[in-house]
Every structure is written in structure tokens, then in C-alpha cells.
């Protein structure tokens, strides 16, 4: 695996105004409110429709080593920034794929939010230990699950008794909020309102610098390899993206055995500026290639990589990440933000009172979905 140099911010994304990026905080490129609701629903339906895979099916995936690499990156982020007893807010939690990671971090309370009803029910099943791919051991923390569009709903109105949270996570999903300025702002407003001062926001999302660079390097409007492709519409034929209109830059993304739906470009330096308006300061941002090369130098994370098997286990399993999968990894970055302010001297003790150790469908809160 060769480490690629970090792409510099694209000049066409430079010098954006800090505050308002257009009238009324709405969308761009013709994306109106009803269309954005429709796009959010399409994304939700796509992920809900994906069935839970058995371990055998998962191991036979054409991108199994990429999935293991992604899990390693998320595990490293959680190990670096979560602490025993932490209260966790997991935005776009999906089917609960990170529950075991949080359990290993010995967190004290977990709230998962996802727009897809099918996914949140699968998350409940996984939490209860009822799937054939999960251990039978119970999780050590109480949990609460909410079915809601976390880029539209005011989550603080529903979670004020659960807050504040010590850590918030949004994995491979925050870019879906950048369809409009209003949704992007609501996403960050939710994080800021629910995190305690000094709390951290960890996440992963597409690296806009890499995606735009790839687009400009290709002759047409589509690029990819044997396991993925990205396609931009003809409205971007000039391959220019004015900094004054950073929202609603849509592309189609297909990844074998994983994703097949519209996504949105997130110019990261503008994301950083927007986050600062919500008292969220950047702590870390690294492209996945840079992240892997840096944290593989630490023995505990190298051992974790061996156990997960993204690069083989160093013993019988000699299979490893393909070049195509490694190229997909280059499309993503990891980030960490911290909420301004001094953390409280004493941890609030009653966050977890609303959680349960066993969940039924009646326990799932549905907020306007």
C-alpha cells in the first residue's frame, strides 16, 4: 500500500463567506425542500432494504477487506476518544454495527438515531443479541433508539433529559446532510446542543478534495475501478464548484455490496468553518491512507488490524486489501471535533435513566419519519 500525498484544498472551493451561503439557508442546484425529503427517504430505503448478512456471506463480500479496514478505523477513533462510563450519541447508527466497539470501550449509555426504520429495528435486534452473527453476551450499557432524520429533527427537544453526551459519532453518513445548508446546519446544531463542553464529535465521510481531483483527472463525468464508480451530472460538466454554493453538489455513488445511492460533496474546509459557528473546533482530520499509515505505527492498533484481518492475520490468512479496495479507502477521511468550553468537574449521573437493557419495538421513538 503506497501512501498518497494529501491533496490540497481545491481552488474552486476557496474563500467562501463564513456565515450565510445563500438566501434562506436553502439548497442549491435546484434542490428544494420536497426534493431533499425525497432524497433522504431514498437513502433511508436503500439502507433499510439491505438485509443483514451472515458471517459466511460477509466473508464472501468482494469488499470484505475494505469493510474490515473501515471497522478498524472506527475502532481506533473510539479507542482514542471514548472513555469508560461515557454517554454516547450515535447519529445515523444504521443496524448497530458499532455496538460491540462501544461495549469494548466500556461506555455507560448509548443513544442511536437513524432515519431508516428497518435499520433501527435491526439495531434493536443486534443490541438484544438475537442475530446469528452476534455474540450471545449482553451488552453492558443501557440503550435508547430513535427513528428520526437527524439532519432535520431538533434532537435536543427530545433528548434534553438524556443530555449532555460525552461523545457523538457519525460514521459514513454526515455527507448526506450537505444536500442543503439548512440540513447541514441542523446536523451540527444537534451535535453542539447535545454534547457537553469538551465533548468530542468523531466521524468519517468522503474526502471532497480527492473526489473532485479524481473527477478533474477523468475525461468524462464518471470514474471508478472494479468495485466502485462515482458519476456526476452534466450540470457539473465544467467541473467547477463555486465556493459561494457549496451545498447540494450531488453525485451518484456505487460500491459493490455496500452503497448505491446519491451522495453530496462536503468541502472540508467549509465544513470546518460551519462547525466553528456551532462551537465545534477541529481536532483532527486525516485521509484514510494517512490515518492507516500513522496509527499502524502504534503496536496496540497494529495488533487490532491483525485481529480484524483487513491485511490478513499474519498467519494462515494471507488475503489482504486489494488495490481497488485501497483506492476506495482513499476517497474517505476521518475527523474529530471538540465542543468549546471546560468539561464539567463532575459527571452527570442520571443520563442513562431513560435507557433499557432489553428493547422492544415499542421502546423505539419515532420522530416525524
UniProtKB/Swiss-Prot annotation:
**mRNA cap 0 methyltransferase domain spans which residues?**
61-340
The EC number of this protein is 2.1.1.56
Sites annotated mRNA cap binding: 95, 101, 126, 175, 263, 332
Compositional bias (Basic and acidic residues): 33-48
Give the function comment from the record.
mRNA-capping methyltransferase that methylates the N7 position of the added guanosine to the 5'-cap structure of mRNAs. Binds RNA containing 5'-terminal GpppC.
User: Which sites bind mRNA?
Assistant: 70-71
| Name of the protein in its database record | mRNA cap guanine-N(7) methyltransferase 1
Residue sites binding S-adenosyl-L-methionine per the record? 74, 92, 114, 149-150, 171-173
**Source species of the chain:** Oryza sativa subsp. japonica (Rice)
UniProt key word Cell inner membrane: no
Gly residues bias located where?
A: 22-32
Q: Which reaction does it catalyse?
A: a 5'-end (5'-triphosphoguanosine)-ribonucleoside in mRNA + S-adenosyl-L-methionine = a 5'-end (N(7)-methyl 5'-triphosphoguanosine)-ribonucleoside in mRNA + S-adenosyl-L-homocysteine
**GO-annotated biological processes:** 7-methylguanosine mRNA capping
Family matches, as PROSITE patterns? RNA_CAP0_MT
Q: Which domain of life is it from?
A: Eukaryota
Amino acid at each position: 500500500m503506497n501512501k498518497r500525498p494529501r491533496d490540497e484544498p481545491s481552488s474552486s472551493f476557496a474563500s467562501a463567506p463564513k456565515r450565510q451561503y445563500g438566501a434562506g439557508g436553502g439548497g442549491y442546484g435546484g434542490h428544494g425542500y420536497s426534493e431533499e425529503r425525497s432524497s433522504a427517504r431514498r437513502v433511508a430505503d436503500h439502507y433499510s432494504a439491505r438485509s443483514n448478512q451472515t458471517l459466511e456471506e460477509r466473508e464472501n463480500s468482494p469488499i470484505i477487506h475494505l469493510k474490515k479496514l473501515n471497522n478498524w478505523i472506527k475502532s481506533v477513533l473510539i479507542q482514542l476518544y471514548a472513555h469508560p462510563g461515557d454517554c454516547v450519541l450515535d447519529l445515523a447508527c444504521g443496524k448497530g454495527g458499532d455496538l460491540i466497539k462501544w461495549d469494548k470501550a466500556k461506555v455507560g449509555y448509548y443513544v442511536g438515531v437513524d432515519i431508516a426504520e428497518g435499520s433501527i429495528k435491526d439495531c434493536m435486534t443486534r443490541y438484544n443479541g438475537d442475530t446469528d452473527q452476534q455474540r450471545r453476551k449482553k451488552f453492558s450499557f443501557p440503550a435508547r433508539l430513535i427513528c428520526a432524520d437527524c439532519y432535520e429533527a431538533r434532537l435536543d427537544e427530545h433528548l434534553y433529559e438524556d443530555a449532555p453526551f460525552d461523545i457523538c459519532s457519525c460514521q459514513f453518513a454526515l455527507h448526506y446532510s450537505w444536500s442543503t445548508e439548512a440540513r447541514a446546519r441542523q446536523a451540527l446544531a444537534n451535535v453542539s446542543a447535545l454534547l457537553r463542553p469538551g465533548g468530542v464529535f468523531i466521524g468519517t465521510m468522503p474526502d471532497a478534495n480527492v473526489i473532485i481531483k479524481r473527477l478533474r483527472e477523468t475525461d468524462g463525468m464518471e470514474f471508478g475501478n472494479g468495485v466502485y464508480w462515482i458519476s456526476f451530472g452534466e450540470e457539473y460538466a465544467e467541473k467547477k464548484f463555486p465556493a459561494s454554493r457549496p451545498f447540494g453538489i450531488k453525485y451518484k455513488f456505487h460500491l459493490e455490496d455496500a452503497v448505491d445511492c446519491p451522495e453530496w460533496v462536503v468541502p472540508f474546509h467549509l465544513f470546518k468553518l460551519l462547525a466553528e459557528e456551532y462551537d465545534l473546533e477541529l481536532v483532527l482530520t486525516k485521509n484514510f491512507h494517512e490515518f492507516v499509515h500513522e496509527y499502524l505505527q502504534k503496536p496496540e492498533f497494529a495488533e487490532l488490524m491483525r485481529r480484524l484481518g483487513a491485511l490478513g492475520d499474519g498467519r494462515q490468512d494471507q488475503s489482504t486489501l486489494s488495490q481497488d479496495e485501497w483506492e476506495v479507502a482513499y476517497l474517505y477521511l476521518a475527523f474529530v471535533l471538540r465542543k468549546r468550553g471546560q468539561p464539567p468537574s463532575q459527571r452527570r449521573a442520571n443520563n442513562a435513566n431513560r435507557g433499557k437493557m432489553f428493547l422492544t419495538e415499542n421502546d423505539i421513538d419515532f420522530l416525524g419519519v
